[in-house]
């Protein structure tokens, strides 16, 4: 049998007989590697450990302690779950299977009833039996005709089979069961170690809302119990921080199916948080030279054709509204064309630059139902949006100014866990970007120079720039572990050209400005969700929807004193309520703690007689007695403390 050439990650090349498996290759390197290995990457493609190698190629051995090793384990655990579902519910139909860095899932459909969370334990027992049986996992090929005949009563498996090219379909044979193959697999069921079936949720078939709703069973798997325990603890923490859960607990927002998915209602508590953020942002921007505007949420479709949004983002836009007289109106997906109109409303001079325009602008995006999530992914959103028009030589200074403002805003919200990413064009594929080499080279050098001057750490990402200019993304992670862009500074050389923007220079001639897109804190919806999760609902006093709750020991005896205190606090712009529900004192105090109110004041006979209050802070067990005047000073100092770092 002829030899094949196998290239290793270090560049070395070695000859092996055709038919050699990754297991053979691993053994040729070391016994210890072979013991840890579970699969391989052949020319970048994840394959089984026992896959025969038929031709030359590059190989990377995949071990248990790698992300790919976990994916292989989860592929196999998902395969065993599919068998368990068939054993427990013979008529069940099976849809998509997927495994990734967060676990795995299996989509299912039952005619009679749904798989309940209570049945997950029974399914886990079946999976554990398959593991203890230590069954070999064989990869076999079945003719497409036979596979379709066997799946005639399962429309979803039938669709998956039909999606496979060719006349044969890859299957896995595990014991007496044959199931569709999904990704690289372990060699034996006994290699599945620690797993957990987590939850059940709904998911549309193939992600399309027009398709049937299936049940998605989620799970995860690890090679070590300690890793599984740590992951389960992380998930529990994420659940406790989930803004959708906290939003319900604190009555911040809700979504009404009668109105539509992705269209949240802000309740008074949530609206108070949002209003406080908006006022803060506007004040911050105005003090930094931004001019705030209001622009229409509707615009003629021609505006978005000229900007390029209609050509490039049409799928993310709602259908145009035909006004019947040839006029087509569109809900705006972005604010930048509107701000360009503000710039273009007057002849601009170089003396006006940088011209900074900002708005809390409402936008609409045609998000699919399956992508919607609480406040993080919605169809109607209000973006903290800003656009600066600068002369080319002002780019670096303006970039520094924007970045300095961003960092100050993060400090005020106590946001610390973020990273900077500079995104450049791909130097090997420049034709897909705005065509001006000198502009790109100068702009990228200016952004990099600004970051270096400020001493801020960053990563560089070639090929991640937008078509029209380089950018800086500020990346963070949500409490659920998802990476999210918190802020962006985007240079744009294209829109000023599309809209023929000019300013009159010192030489009396017209010059083209550069446009800088800038979002400090994303949308109000997404930022509120993010803050809810990082604070775990315990908002700092300046942001808390209710800052103080006053509990009179007896409404009849002490209610008037509680009302007097509340009036004094309201006069100082402190958000306060008096709890006169008449429940037991212990219950009312616990309820205030449950709703994460920063200060709880208890007033009784002693407090009323000497003009004092008994103060309990959120998260603390002890109470402190002080005069009402002293408390007002303390809470006002607490409210003002968020901006001390920036004074």
From Swiss-Prot:
EC number(s) on file: 6.1.1.3
Source organism (scientific name): Levilactobacillus brevis (strain ATCC 367 / BCRC 12310 / CIP 105137 / JCM 1170 / LMG 11437 / NCIMB 947 / NCTC 947)
Protein's recorded name: Threonine--tRNA ligase
One GO cellular component, as annotated: cytoplasm
Key words, A-Z: Aminoacyl-tRNA synthetase, ATP-binding, Cytoplasm, Ligase, Metal-binding, Nucleotide-binding, Protein biosynthesis, RNA-binding, tRNA-binding, Zinc
Binding site for Zn(2+): 336, 387, 517
Alphabetized GO MF terms: ATP binding; catalytic activity, acting on a protein; metal ion binding; threonine-tRNA ligase activity; transferase activity; tRNA binding
InterPro entries for this protein: aa-tRNA-synt_IIb, aa-tRNA-synth_II, aa-tRNA-synth_II/BPL/LPL, Anticodon-bd, Anticodon-bd_dom_sf, Beta-grasp_dom_sf, TGS, TGS-like
One Pfam family named in its UniProt record: TGS
């Amino acid at each position: 049998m002829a030899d094949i050439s196998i290239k290793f990650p270090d560049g070395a090349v070695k000859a092996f007989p055709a038919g050699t498996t990754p297991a053979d290759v691993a053994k040729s390197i070391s016994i210890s590697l072979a013991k840890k290995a579970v699969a391989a990457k052949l020319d970048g493609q994840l394959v089984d450990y026992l896959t025969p190698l038929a031709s030359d190629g590059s190989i990377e051995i995949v071990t248990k302690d790698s992300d790919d090793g976990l994916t292989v384990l989860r592929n196999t655990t998902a395969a065993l779950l599919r068998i368990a579902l068939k054993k427990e519910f013979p008529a069940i139909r099976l849809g998509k299977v997927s495994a990734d860095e967060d676990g795995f899932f299996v989509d299912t459909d039952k005619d009679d009833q749904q798989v309940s969370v209570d049945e997950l334990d029974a399914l886990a027992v079946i999976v554990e039996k398959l593991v203890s049986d230590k069954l070999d996992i064989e990869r076999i090929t079945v003719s497409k005709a036979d596979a379709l005949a066997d799946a005639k009563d399962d429309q979803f498996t039938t669709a998956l089979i039909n999606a496979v090219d060719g006349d044969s379909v890859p299957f896995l044979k595990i014991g007496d069961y044959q199931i569709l193959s999904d990704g690289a697999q372990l060699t034996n069921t006994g290699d599945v170690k620690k797993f957990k079936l987590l939850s059940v949720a709904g998911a549309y078939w193939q992600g399309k809302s027009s398709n049937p709703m299936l049940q998605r069973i989620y799970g995860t798997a690890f090679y070590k119990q300690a890793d599984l325990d740590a992951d389960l603890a992380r998930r529990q923490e994420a659940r406790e921080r989930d803004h959708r859960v906290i939003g319900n607990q604190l009555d911040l927002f809700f979504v009404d199916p009668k109105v539509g998915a992705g269209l949240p209602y802000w309740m008074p508590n949530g609206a108070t948080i949002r209003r406080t953020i908006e006022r803060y942002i506007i004040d911050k921007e105005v003090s930094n030279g931004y001019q705030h505007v209001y622009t229409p949420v509707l615009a003629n479709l021609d505006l978005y054709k000229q900007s390029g949004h209609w050509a490039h983002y049409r799928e993310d836009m709602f259908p145009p509204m035909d006004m019947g007289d040839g006029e087509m109106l569109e809900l705006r997906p972005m604010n930048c064309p509107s701000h360009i109109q503000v710039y273009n409303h007057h002849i601009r001079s170089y003396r006006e630059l940088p011209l900074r325009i900002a708005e809390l602008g409402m936008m609409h995006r045609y998000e699919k139902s399956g992508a919607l999530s609480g406040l993080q992914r919605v169809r109607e959103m209000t973006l903290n949006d800003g656009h600066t028009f600068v002369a080319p030589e002002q780019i670096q200074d303006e970039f520094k100014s924007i970045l300095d403002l961003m960092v100050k805003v993060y400090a005020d919200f106590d946001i610390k866990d973020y990273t900077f990413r500079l995104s450049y064009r791909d130097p090997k594929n420049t034709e897909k970007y705005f065509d001006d080499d000198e502009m790109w080279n100068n702009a990228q050098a200016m952004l990099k120079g600004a970051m270096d001057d400020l001493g801020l750490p960053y990563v560089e990402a070639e090929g991640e720039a937008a078509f029209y200019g380089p950018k800086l993304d500020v990346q963070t992670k949500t409490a659920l572990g998802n990476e999210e862009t918190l802020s962006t500074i985007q240079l744009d050389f294209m829109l000023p050209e599309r809209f023929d923007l000019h300013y009159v220079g010192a030489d009396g001639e017209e010059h083209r400005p550069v446009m800088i897109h800038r979002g400090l804190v994303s949308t109000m919806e997404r930022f509120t969700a993010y803050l809810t999760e990082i604070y775990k609902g315990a908002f700092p006093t300046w942001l808390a929807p209710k800052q103080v709750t006053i509990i009179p020991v007896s409404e009849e005896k002490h209610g008037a004193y509680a009302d007097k205190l509340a009036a004094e606090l309201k006069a100082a712009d402190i958000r306060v309520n008096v709890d006169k529900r008449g429940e037991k004192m212990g219950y009312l105090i616990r309820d205030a703690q449950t709703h994460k109110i920063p200060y709880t004041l208890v007033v009784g006979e002693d407090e009323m007689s000497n003009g004092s209050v008994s103060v309990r802070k959120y998260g603390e067990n002890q109470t402190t007695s002080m005069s009402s005047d002293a408390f007002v000073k303390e809470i006002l100092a607490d409210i003002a403390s968020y901006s001390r770092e920036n004074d």
